[in-house]
């Protein structure tokens, strides 16, 4: 049971909380550059100024989830073209921060570098313009950042926040003119956002939450706790809601396979392997192909 706790404890953007990253190998750096170049081409080819981008930072497939962490790739990010603005947990200060990360570095955060998955959601211009402007407004973006982090923050809780929750609330501020987190969550409820329901193996899992400083149960409804459920913000639930709200939004997934980089319109199913199927596009052929 404890083995189930570790991935969920870090699922919402902390990516193995406070472990020291090893230095990437030359091959891994080359892969990340190749992968990020393909993503950049997809975003620029659509005339985008912004894309929601998600990675498989941790393996959540046992809960029916492919992606664990999302941010906004911004064409005009002062940190560099298409750098990803995101919430991350600052281990040195013990607090969440906003972080602009280069696209290649974001790609390197994949759970399995040799077969990583990335998702892009390309929004229509009428949606992306307001979100792009707000994301680059440091004062307003920081105003939605809560100082207390929880990986399993309740989707409509105000006491804690995780990275994907901040992203949803940023969207509410951009499109619903919400001025604070409470207003943002009220607007999200009105617009049909419900987060993602994770069905846990059983109630004993909840007792183990006390072992992690990154998990909190205080705000989760009693009926969810009784049923061993957690309702939190994860990339898939956020992308599903955005596609319902903006039917013209385009979902594209890219993964690394032995054949090369594979692009799939509409995305991969959570349990799907990275294998070329009819309708897919091989973006970059691998030099390992025979």
Regions found by a protein language model. Name each.
Residues 5-10:
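N-terminal signal peptide c-region/cleavage motif recognized by signal peptidases
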């Amino acid at each position: 049971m404890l083995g189930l706790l570790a991935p969920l404890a870090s699922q919402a953007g902390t990516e193995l909380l406070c472990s020291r990253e090893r230095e990437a190998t030359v091959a891994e750096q080359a892969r990340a550059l190749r992968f990020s170049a393909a993503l950049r081409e997809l975003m620029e080819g659509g005339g985008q100024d912004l894309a929601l981008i998600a990675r498989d930072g941790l393996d959540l497939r046992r809960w029916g989830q492919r992606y664990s962490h999302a941010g906004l790739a911004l064409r005009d990010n002062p940190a560099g073209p298409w750098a990803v603005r995101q919430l991350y947990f600052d281990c040195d200060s013990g607090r969440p921060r906003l972080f602009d990360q280069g696209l290649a570095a974001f790609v390197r955060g994949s759970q399995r570098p040799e077969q990583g998955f990335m998702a892009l959601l390309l929004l229509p211009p009428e949606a992306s313009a307001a979100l792009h402007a707000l994301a680059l407004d440091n004062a307003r973006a920081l105003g939605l950042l809560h100082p207390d982090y929880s990986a399993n923050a309740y989707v409509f809780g105000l006491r804690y926040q995780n990275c994907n929750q901040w992203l949803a609330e940023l969207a509410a501020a951009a499109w619903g003119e919400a001025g604070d987190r409470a207003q943002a969550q009220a607007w999200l409820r009105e617009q049909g956002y419900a987060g993602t329901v994770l069905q846990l193996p059983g109630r004993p899992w909840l007792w183990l939450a006390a072992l992690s400083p990154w998990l909190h149960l205080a705000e989760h409804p009693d009926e969810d706790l009784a049923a061993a459920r957690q309702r939190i913000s994860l990339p898939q639930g956020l992308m599903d809601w955005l596609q319902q709200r903006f039917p013209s939004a385009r979902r594209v997934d890219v993964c690394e396979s032995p054949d090369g980089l594979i692009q799939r319109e509409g995305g991969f199913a959570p349990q799907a392997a990275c294998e070329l199927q009819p309708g897919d596009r091989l973006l970059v052929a691998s030099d390992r192909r025979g």
